[in-house]
Amino acid sequence: MSNEMHENHTQFSEEAWDELNVVMEAVREEINLTCRAFLNDDKEMAQRVAPLGMIITSLCNELKMHHVERLSNGNCGLEEGTVYTDILNSFNRIAAHCASAMVALLKSGDENPDMHIHDSKIYPSDSVEYYTYFKEYRQKYEIVKNEEHMRSMEPEEVE
């Protein structure tokens, strides 16, 4: 995608960059949580991944709606919008992969583990822990219009 953007001289608006940075930080945190939980066999940390994944999905949906607004107001072109949407879809896929890895971790040691996330009751969304983490991440990664967010595309090492 970055090559396509460079070759076609595609540029996002500052608002689009700000929004992408928020969801990108959430994805980075989810990847770091997933890696640390997996490397340390930390099932407690693994339970933080699903609520963060739901926040990422929600953010991506919200940002797609913001893109539609920019498109309808003439503040964004189709080419930029296609790349923007592709990036958001990639973030969603990363979140799903992290959740799948954590299902495998949380079910490891079970006598008959069913590793299919869609059948899994491993992430009860009605638990107090899930709601607590969800609320924490919702506040941390809230999209606020016209608020300055640091624009960073630098790679980050797993902590």
Across the structure, where does each feature detected by a protein language model lie?
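Cytosolic, long alpha-helical scaffolding segments
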Residues: 1-159
